Amino acid sequence: MAAKPQLRPSTARAAEVRPLVMRCGAFGDMVLLTVLLQQLSLRFGKPVDVISSGPWTQPLLESESAVGRLFVIRSRRTPYWLSLQQHRLVAWLRERGSGPTWFCDRGEGRGLLSRAGIPDDYICDTNAYTWAPTDTFADRYLRLGSYTPKAFEGLLPPAKPGVPAAARLNIAPAALRELEMWLAERQLTGRQFVIVHPGSRHIARRWLRPRSGTSKYWPEENWAKVVTAVRDVCPDHAILFSGTRSEGRFNAAIIRRAGVPDVYNVADDLSVGTLLALLQRAHSMISVDTGPAHAAAALGCPTLALFGTAPPILYRPGGTTTPAIALTGTVEGRQSILGITPEAVIDAWLDLLNTARTPLSDIS
């Protein structure tokens, strides 16, 4: 019987280090990342350390039991010698020790792992794998979390079966309390409400230019027709328009066109934590393909997302099994949000509400 190869003691020790994930993504990207974090946490039986960026990441992940240490940096593109944050990150990585690592960005930031002394064969890099065109991001993350870095073959526990192909968010108790106060201040306590999120950062940046040049712009008159239909179907529900401060003017233009009562423009009126608590409680959400739509679906809110040019299967809100519909249209044979009619949105929203009454396990 052949003897087993001698194992380097350093590699054996490194296999015991908590798993590390690096993903510096937008709001929705970080929501979807929770699928991988859940997969790895269950696989290793311990929380996962995370390197990320963006002011939304802390409130999104701070209550996740799958997350251990969260290290947020402002930028990966700043030259290393100019970034105190990057120096601190590298120092922390060296102190924690190298271990199984999953890199989930396009390329920026990989050099920071190298500076910290993490060997290439300790890393599963998402760019090194081929993905099926029918995969959602949740499917990809489940598969990525089942892979083992080359150096640790035979040393790590296998992936656990049965991890849902859906993002998961937990809301901090403080955010729930903040929501109660927020609702009370606006005399919305006990009310049901539908959330509409028509804007995106791409639209907001084009305030002085034609918005039709951005892939996520859907005309104000279309949104107004949808809002009117929502009011007819849900006469007793409040309608809340969410968004950032720069998206507030777009919201206001739609609200003026719709001319229906009991509509609130709450753009820039919500912290990330309070927004999550609001989404969890909402009757439903109608949105462009944007981060809050992923969060709403992950929180169990029936979510209809209007897609521009992004792949609707890959970026399906919240993953594979959430209560969501990714709606697309075509113009001259090409996928375009401008090919979606208000009637299609209303019909899809009504279908979604009927589907959402079935158990989540039955939703595909």
Sequence positions of predicted segments:
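Catalytic machinery of carbohydrate-active enzymes
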Residues: 1-364
